[in-house]
Amino acid sequence: MYAVIKTGGKQYRVREGQILRVESLGANEGDKVEFDQVMMVGEGADVKLGAPLVEGAKVAATVTANGRGKKVTIIKFRRRKNRSRTKQGHRQNYTEVEITGISA
């Protein structure tokens, strides 16, 4: 069984037992979280599509880790201007979850 969930402004296709990195949820390690914005649920040829969400569908998960991703570097150059260069960078926070159940 698989599902398409929406969290952190992104959509993910998940199935039970899968480990997934999503935008930071603010939950501690070992906490149980529930995603209720389920856009699609499928098992074999049986597919339920939401418009935009599937009613009553939920995906349960357990938080396995919190961390920070690799550094993303941004460099801006402005042509024909003396010393007009900018270098910035940031590390995005993430939450790693393990999908424990899908119910529709």
From Swiss-Prot:
This is Large ribosomal subunit protein bL21. GO terms for cellular component: cytoplasm; ribonucleoprotein complex; ribosome. Part of the 50S ribosomal subunit. Contacts protein L20. GO terms for biological process: translation. This protein binds to 23S rRNA in the presence of protein L20. The keyword Transit peptide does not apply. GO terms for molecular function: rRNA binding; structural constituent of ribosome. Keywords: Ribonucleoprotein, Ribosomal protein, RNA-binding, rRNA-binding. Coiled coil: none annotated.
